[in-house]
Curated annotation (Swiss-Prot):
GO terms for molecular function: 5'-3' RNA exonuclease activity; rRNA binding. The lineage of its organism: Eukaryota, Fungi, Dikarya, Ascomycota, Saccharomycotina. Residues 889-970 have a biased composition (Low complexity). Residues 389-419, 690-730 form a coiled coil. GO terms for biological process: cleavage in ITS2 between 5.8S rRNA and LSU-rRNA of tricistronic rRNA transcript (SSU-rRNA, 5.8S rRNA, LSU-rRNA); mRNA splicing, via spliceosome; NAD-cap decapping; negative regulation of transcription elongation by RNA polymerase II; nuclear mRNA surveillance; nuclear polyadenylation-dependent rRNA catabolic process; positive regulation of termination of RNA polymerase II transcription; sno(s)RNA processing. Residues 117-145, 516-534 have a biased composition (Basic and acidic residues). GO terms for cellular component: Las1 complex; RNA polymerase II termination complex. PANTHER family: 5'-3' EXORIBONUCLEASE 2 (PTHR12341:SF41), 5'->3' EXORIBONUCLEASE (PTHR12341). This is 5'-3' exoribonuclease 2.
Length: 1003
């Protein structure tokens, strides 16, 4: 998710979440690294690669020359991936995910990026041609290979293109090569989800994690790591509720190299190329520790004034949800919120003030309470006017300081040009020559006519220079040094902050540290320097009436009736959008077809009377089906990138008779929307009409070749294991000897669960050839590894909770860190006033994570452990103790529930989780072990708070949290929520299993 500046903001606000990656040797060749050595960064179980974060920098790097051919790109991908694996060294699972067909909600952003990329490539090509002509006119010789070479089209990194098909083949070969040749990979299970598998790469990875969590044998202490450059990986890591989670990424701010210019490419020597390659190989990487971020959020989000128990998992979900308003890939951010202006902190403060009044959290398991959303945004709306004014004042201050800084640099440069040429060896007696811009003065001090004259202010500021015209060179040099030192001091004191007090203090410092000078009034500065280009901002958010001007300017409407109509529709669509995004993060894609149909977002003040806007029908999504690869290509690519499409489809982009020609404008408007940088502008492209597009493509599908049809087909993930893996013999025998169509396997055996299916492209006794024409890598004997199609376990409702058996990390933050977060290092006699409920008293000397192990987080209301805990306590109060032999298999206080047991749901009895049992956490008589049948009924009749009716293995509970929502029901084509509700909220019947009640919560 593109949230510019988010990573930098997080790392500055929460500094301990970042640590450098320790590398043994980053210059080794492929295959030479000792993958099996202990990891100096700490051991990891599973590594997830968002491959688009590797493919993009390898195929079109910004700081060095791009590879000459696609084969070179793939070899660079191998080398880069091998380096990442050496850092992480996963021991159990490696999943490689490439972006597949995206949901329609993401295609709008992809379309904007690719159209602008094609436009930038065109401008760069024209500039290159101009510079070549200019150099040749000066007599320089330009290599014909450089002149005739076109830049590679990065839009080829889109599902359905020949490049992505070749990338998938290359990755499959490389994984097989590593399994066959690297002993450290012997027990590693590798899943490749290439571009033929629908879904964004990072969300396919999250779906995999959720699917593994749903297995009853899943180890809650699995250590996860995800690699990628997108900021939303941080949110996704939090959304898994897996505290043993890290994010690995390049340190993009270390040794920042400027983007390579065209002139550099035309004149770069081989030594320069080698130097850049050496620097690139040493680029540092960073860990982002999600467990430490959870510690920070636990302190910051804790509110001592709640009328209900503080639940960290639910609070984190609310925090992730609030970050969506600041920026995401599916919706424009609210105008009043920006990461650079601390928009997240502003919204969190509103949330903390409102939460005691809300009486519950805003989100639950990916579902929204829309009434609470309205109250949150209403609290923000009171600040909008002030936010816009302060933002404008800050921008003006920055502009003024930039102007002063630029003018000071120009003055300093002019003074250097005046003094330095006159200071030469052996000419001590030579007088200084007056600058041509200096006024010629008569003996009376009047300026002589016919000479350039400076303003009175310039004369005053330069009077020392004028009066020292006859000084010796030595004196002039000393004067110059003193003046330059003064200028440097002046410049260092001009880092103006947003605080008026600091500004005033710095102004005083300027007066004290400069000789015979003072800060120039800004009106004079503006009069002397060219004015900056106007951004065409007609809204002027900092002035009254901006909301009216916003809708009039952006939508071309005038009447109040039209404005209100657009405003209401935007609010409804935006509410659908935030509901869609939250479900997408926590449960998977709720609808492949939904998208936000506007380029702009409403104001926080517009979110009023939400129930009237939404209506009784609420917010519902229909799952639908993803686009095919060619349908996405036709939706997001400009005509200039049509070469990535089959010829029979490409013609629709440029043929004047094409019925969808209007989808591909060559010129389009960019609305700067009050921003300064071109990349921050909004590309006003027409939205794709899905029906028109599909009808046009359907007429031409029959003209495709067999290879082209193959690229347009959606497929499954592929699983690779070595012949040393413990599942190798079983998979081989069942699929090839016994001809079983598909084979399910559980988590306990190899720390991976799912279903394997025979892969038609894999021949067990065949040969896998090296697919590239460049490079020297061998063909592989298929007997060295095993390849099959792979399906994840059946999807179940994800729960925002820690899984029982989780062993926490040793706490990282100190009391000083807590005070810094709570009080900003300003204790003011209130040392540690608001202690969080989990302080040092919660440590026990127990557990494998260190000398001290933090106690497991308190059980969530509605959680399975809470259910068993309450069941046991009430039986102890009202029933006679049962014999010990009746309690044996269900005692949750004995050694089988210790922290050292990762799977403590009776997994030592009856072979773990018997398939025939409806309740996998105990046997069928577990309730009778606690009480008789009558007391079991009492839990349904007397205690509605703990009325669960748990009908599946993983806790789709019926609880008292009021979250069988009406707002975000989505049609799963029969895969509905399995929970039932007896707490007073009557669900509406729905054949797909969607339930809703009257209180505004969707499920």
């Amino acid at each position: 998710m593109g949230v510019p500046a988010l990573f930098r903001w997080l790392s500055r606000k929460y500094p301990k979440i970042i640590s450098p990656v320790v590398e043994d040797d980053v210059t080794q060749e492929i295959g030479a690294a000792q993958f099996s050595d202990p990891n100096p960064n700490g051991e990891l179980d599973n590594l997830y690669l968002d491959m688009n974060g590797i493919v993009h920098p390898c195929s079109h790097p910004e700081h060095k020359l791009p590879p000459e051919t696609e084969d070179e790109m793939f070899l660079d991908v191998f080398k880069y991936t091998d380096r990442v694996l050496l850092m992480a060294r996963p021991r159990k699972v490696l999943m490689i995910a490439v972006d597949g067909v995206a949901p329609r909600a993401k295609m709008n952003q992809q379309r904007s990026r690719r159209f602008r990329s094609a436009q930038d490539a065109k401008i760069a090509h024209e500039e290159k041609e101009r510079q070549i002509r200019e150099r040749e006119s000066r007599g320089e010789s330009i290599d014909d290979a450089i002149k005739g070479k076109k830049s590679w089209d990065s839009n080829a990194i889109t599902p359905g293109t020949p490049f992505m098909d070749s990338l998938a083949q290359a990755l499959r070969y490389w994984v097989a090569y590593k399994l066959a040749t690297d002993p450290g990979w012997a027990n590693l299970q590798v899943i490749i989800s290439d571009a033929t598998v629908p879904g964004e790469g990072e969300h396919k990875l999250m779906s995999f994690i959720r699917s593994q969590r749903s297995d009853p044998e899943y180890d809650p202490n699995t250590k996860h790591c995800i690699y990628g450059l997108d900021a939303d990986l941080i949110f996704l890591g939090l959304a898994t509720h897996e505290p043993h989670f890290r994010v690995l990424r390049e340190d993009v701010f270390a040794n920042q190299s400027r983007q390579m210019r065209i002139s550099d490419q035309l004149s770069m020597t081989q030594d320069q190329k080698d130097s850049i390659a050496e620097q690139d190989a040493k680029k540092p990487f960073l860990w982002l520790h999600v467990n430490v971020l959870r510690e920070y959020l636990e302190i910051e989000l804790y509110n001592p004034h709640l009328s209900f128990p503080f639940d960290l998992e639910r609070a984190i979900d609310d925090w992730v949800f609030m970050c969506f308003f600041v920026g995401n890939d599916f919706l424009p951010h609210l105008p009043s919120l920006d990461v650079r202006d601390n928009g997240i902190d502003i919204l969190v403060n509103c949330w903390k003030r409102m939460l005691p009044k809300l009486r519950d959290y805003i989100t639950c398991d990916g579902n929204l309470n829309l009434e609470s959303v309205e109250k949150l945004l209403s609290s923000l709306s009171y600040k909008e006017d002030e936010i816009f004014r302060k933002r404008h004042e800050g921008e003006k201050r920055r502009e003024e300081n930039d102007k002063r800084r630029k003018l000071a640099q120009e003055e300093e440069k002019a003074l250097k040009n005046q003094y330095i040429p006159q200071v030469s060896k052996g000419s001590d007696k030579a007088p200084l020559t007056a600058d041509i811009n200096m006024p010629l003065l008569s003996t009376s001090g009047d300026a002589v006519e016919g000479y350039a004259q400076l303003s009175n202010k310039d004369i005053v500021e330069n009077r020392d220079v004028i009066t020292k015209a006859n000084m010796s060179n030595a004196d002039a040099a000393a004067a110059l040094k003193k003046l330059l030192d003064s200028k440097n001091n002046k410049e260092s004191d001009k880092n103006v902050s947003a605080s008026a007090a600091i500004q005033e203090q710095q102004n005083k410092s300027d007066i004290n540290t400069t000789e015979n000078s003072k800060k120039r009034p800004i009106d004079q500065v503006e009069a002397e320097l060219p004015k900056p280009d106007e951004n065409g901002d007609s809204v002027r958010m900092w002035e009254p009436g901006y909301r009216q001007r916003y809708y009039q300017s952006k939508f071309g409407v005038v009447s109040e009736e039209e404005i209100n109509k657009i405003r209401r529709d935007m609010v409804r669509c935006y509410l659908e959008g935030i509901s869609w995004v939250l479900l997408y993060y926590y449960q998977g894609c709720p609808s492949w077809q939904w998208y936000y149909p506007y380029h702009y977002a409403p104001f926080a003040a517009d979110f009023v009377n939400i129930n009237d806007i939404i209506g009784e029908q609420g917010i519902k999504f229909t799952l639908g089906e993803p686009f095919k690869p060619y349908e996405q290509l036709m939706s997001v690519l400009p005509a200039a990138s049509g070469h990535n499409l089959p010829e029979v489809l490409r013609i629709l982009m440029s043929d004047p008779s094409s019925e969808i020609l209007d989808f591909y404008p060559e010129e389009f408007q960019i609305d700067m929307n009050g921003k300064k940088m071109s990349w921050q502008g909004i590309a006003l492209l027409p939205f794709i009409d899905e029906n028109r597009l599909l009808e046009a493509l359907e007429k031409r599908y029959h003209l495709l070749t067999d290879d082209e049809r193959e690229r347009n087909t959606l497929k499954n993930e592929v699983l690779f294991i070595s012949n040393q893996n413990k599942n190798y013999k079983r998979f081989y025998n069942e699929l090839y000897d016994n001809n079983v169509k598909e084979l399910k396997f559980r988590f306990s055996r190899s720390s991976l669960a799912g279903t394997v299916i025979k892969n038609e492209y894999f021949v067990p006794d065949g040969i896998t050839k090296f697919p590239l024409s460049e490079g020297d890598m061998p063909d592989l004997n298929n007997i060295e590894f095993f390849q099959s199609s792979y399906k994840m376990p059946t999807k179940k409702m994800g729960k925002s909770m820690l899984i029982n058996g989780y062993i926490s990390h040793t706490r990282t933050l100190t009391q000083e860190d807590r005070d810094s977060i709570l009080h900003g290092n300003q204790r003011n006699g209130g040392y540690n006033r608001f202690r969080t409920p989990n302080d040092n008293s919660g440590y026990v000397n127990k557990g494998p994570s260190g000398k001290e192990d933090y106690l497991i987080y308190s059980m969530r209301r509605g959680g399975y452990r809470a259910f068993m805990h309450n069941l046991k306590n009430q039986n102890q109060q009202h029933q006679q103790p049962v014999p010990m032999n009746a309690m044996a298999n269900n005692s949750y206080d004995n050694q089988y529930n210790s922290y050292s047991n990762n799977n403590n749901y009776n997994n030592n009895y009856n072979g773990g989780y018997p398939n025939q049992s409806n309740n996998n956490y105990s046997n069928q008589n577990s309730y009778n072990n606690y009480s008789n049948q009558n007391s079991y009924n009492n839990y349904n009749n007397q205690n509605s708070y703990n009325n669960y009716n748990n009908r599946n293995n993983h806790g789709n509970y019926n609880n008292y949290n009021r979250y069988n929502n009406q707002g975000s029901n989505y049609d799963r084509q029969g895969q509905g929520n399995a929970s039932s509700n007896r707490s007073g909220y009557i669900p509406a019947p729905n054949r797909t299993g969607n339930f809703r009640n009257r209180n505004g919560y969707n499920r």
